[in-house]
């Protein structure tokens, strides 16, 4: 019984809208209350009630090394002693920028910001400023943060709470957002046939992670690249989730597709608030102060986040991505077999160190098919796994994450818990 968590949640609801600072954390999508965390280490979360959970959420993606990795925490401790914010450039900004540029094929220059939302909204402004066009192609169910242009048919918490858009976003703002189903290249071609001369950019999660995990079909990303080249539009890869996760060089390295602009977040801050956007030099040089497209931030390039990011990328650069992916692949096959043995419809999508359990018999290739999965079955699964110390995303529209800190025993514990689930 999570008594202290319940007490804190009740108090939080009097002070914070919904009791949380990001909607999906409220656990409304799984008919539960949130757990309040006291500390975390490795693959474990420890609650204010003294409970311990094996964490398959990883703070929604940043903790690929696990919680409180010693090299990352040492770097942050050292940075704190040097000052928490300067409002001026520091050496670590240059060091982290160089690491990002070296790792990602599509990034010649990079600008640090404070969140993935800042990164995507800044990249869109830059794309519009560079091309002189206004329209944006995005995909139904993909989530690119909570900036106004991206909230049309978005995924993540918007999907979890069944919000079709959001009040407060003028129709005039989303009028320039053109929608297509994810993985549907023909639909994108139709949009370009109608609006090609006005489209500034396509923004896409190269691997969708906010409608649950949905990998791109063969030829989909290549087709987007070709359409942008044909029509003079920019291709923006939202790699806030996939950057440094699906390979050290992100989805663009894994799939061999070079975008014009890339947005980053999560992993590059090692768990501290951070975001970034980068791309081709000729495009990035249009950003102020060397260009006319304005973007700024008081805490951008924060020394604590830069130190954490440097340490995180240093460790990841020598980590065994292939080994982790092989372990996750074998684990997912066994998990799927266990759940199918219980007589429920189930498909598990997986790529690299991510997976999503969809309770459906049909392939999940876009948001429409993701929504056909049985939400009640997911809620039951979530509750029973949580009761056994397994912490999964409190939403059927989020990806589960495995970190380098997860041991074979951790994965075995999840499988054992799944065997005890009843439907």
From Swiss-Prot:
| Catalytic activity of the protein | (S)-4-amino-5-oxopentanoate = 5-aminolevulinate
Q: Which GO terms describe its biological process?
A: protoporphyrinogen IX biosynthetic process
Location in the cell? Cytoplasm
UniProt keyword annotation of Isomerase present:
yes
Q: What is its main location?
A: cytoplasm
Question: Cellular component GO terms, alphabetically?
Answer: cytoplasm
Query: Which keywords belong to this entry?
Result: Cytoplasm, Isomerase, Porphyrin biosynthesis, Pyridoxal phosphate
Family designation: Belongs to the class-III pyridoxal-phosphate-dependent aminotransferase family. HemL subfamily.
Q: What protein name is recorded for this chain?
A: Glutamate-1-semialdehyde 2,1-aminomutase
Gene (name only) = hemL
């Amino acid at each position: 019984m999570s008594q202290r968590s319940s007490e804190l949640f009740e108090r939080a609801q009097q002070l914070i809208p919904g009791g949380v600072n990001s909607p999906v954390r409220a656990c409304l999508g799984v008919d539960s209350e949130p757990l309040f965390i006291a500390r975390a280490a490795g693959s474990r979360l420890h609650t204010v009630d003294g409970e311990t959970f094996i964490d398959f959420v990883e703070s929604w993606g940043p903790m690929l090394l696990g919680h409180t990795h010693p090299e990352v925490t040492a770097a942050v401790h050292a940075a704190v002693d040097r000052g928490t914010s300067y409002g001026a450039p520091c050496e670590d900004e240059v060091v982290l920028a160089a690491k990002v540029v070296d790792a990602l094929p599509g990034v010649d220059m990079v600008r640090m910001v404070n969140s993935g939302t800042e990164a995507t909204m800044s990249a869109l402004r830059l794309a519009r400023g560079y091309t002189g066009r206004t329209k944006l192609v995005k995909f139904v169910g993909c989530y690119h943060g909570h900036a106004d242009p991206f909230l049309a048919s978005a995924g993540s918490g918007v999907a979890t709470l069944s919000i079709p858009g959001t009040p407060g976003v003028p129709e005039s703002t989303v009028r320039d957002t053109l929608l297509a189903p994810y993985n549907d290249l023909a639909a994108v071609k139709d949009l370009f046939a109608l609006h090609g001369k006005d489209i500034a950019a396509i923004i896409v999660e190269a691997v969708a992670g906010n409608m649950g995990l949905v990998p791109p079909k063969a030829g989909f990303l290549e087709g987007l690249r070709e359409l942008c080249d044909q029509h003079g539009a920019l291709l923006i890869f939202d790699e806030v989730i996939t950057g440094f996760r699906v390979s050290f060089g992100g989805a663009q390295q894994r799939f061999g597709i070079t975008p014009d602009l890339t947005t980053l977040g999560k992993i590059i801050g090692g768990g501290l608030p951070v975001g970034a956007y980068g791309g081709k030099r000729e495009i990035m040089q249009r950003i102020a102060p060397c260009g006319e497209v304005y973007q700024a931030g008081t805490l951008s390039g924060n020394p604590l986040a830069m130190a954490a990011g440097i340490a995180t990328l240093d460790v990841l650069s020598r980590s065994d991505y292939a080994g982790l992916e092989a372990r996750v692949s074998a684990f997912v096959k066994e998990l799927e077999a266990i759940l199918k043995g219980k007589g429920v419809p189930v498909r598990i999508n997986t790529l690299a160190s991510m997976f999503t359990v969809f309770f459906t018999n049909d392939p999940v290739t876009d948001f429409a098919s993701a929504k056909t999965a049985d939400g009640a079955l997911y809620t039951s699964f979530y509750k029973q796994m949580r009761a056994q110390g397994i912490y999964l995303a409190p939403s059927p529209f989020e990806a589960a994450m495995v970190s380098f800190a997860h041991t074979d025993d951790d994965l075995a514990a999840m499988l054992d818990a799944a065997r005890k689930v009843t439907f």
